[in-house]
């Protein structure tokens, strides 16, 4: 999973824990974090980083690597045309959730093979980052488990 431009260390920690418990293979972060921020991330993740690789890289490197290795990129953003349950989230898929304020970057959207939308029916225009990650991660897990049965 890529957490595109996500800034808040506590949010990152919580989402890393969600990614790990949902069976993600790795977490990709395209932001620079200080030693102290990385400690905060580890604490908030309940040390889930012991069980899942957390890779700090650049947007350009991760997009190139994803394409070179045959990964489909599926981003969650409000411009999406369908829900995550209508998209195949199995196999080599990099799920992307964007930053707290700006969402998924244009570079990542341009490289995405699909953009899904999480439905909302309230007045607040977006979900908390942790909720968005949970919805995507659990739907991907659900689809993988369905394929096994």
Language-model features: locations:
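Alpha-helical structural signal
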Residues: 12, 93, 105, 134-137
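Short amphipathic alpha-helical segments
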Residues: 14-15, 40-41, 86-88, 107-110, ...
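Active-site/ligand-binding-proximal alpha/beta "capping" segment
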Residues: 75-121
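Structured adenosyl-cofactor binding patch, chiefly the S-adenosyl-L-methionine
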Residues: 109-149
């Amino acid at each position: 999973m890529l957490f595109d431009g996500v800034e808040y260390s506590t949010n990152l920690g919580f989402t890393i824990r969600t990614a790990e418990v949902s069976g993600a293979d790795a977490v990709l972060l395209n932001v620079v974090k200080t030693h102290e921020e990385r400690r905060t991330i580890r604490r908030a993740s309940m040390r889930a980083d012991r069980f899942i690789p957390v890779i700090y890289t650049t947007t350009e490197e991760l997009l190139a690597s994803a394409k070179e290795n045959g990964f489909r990129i599926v981003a969650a953003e409000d411009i999406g045309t369908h829900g995550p349950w209508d998209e195949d989230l199995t196999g080599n898929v990099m799920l992307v959730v964007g930053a707290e304020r700006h969402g998924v970057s244009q570079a990542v959207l341009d490289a995405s093979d699909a953009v899904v939308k999480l439905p909302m029916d309230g007045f607040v225009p977006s979900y908390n980052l942790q909720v968005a990650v949970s919805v995507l991660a659990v739907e991907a897990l659900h689809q993988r488990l369905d394929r096994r049965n």
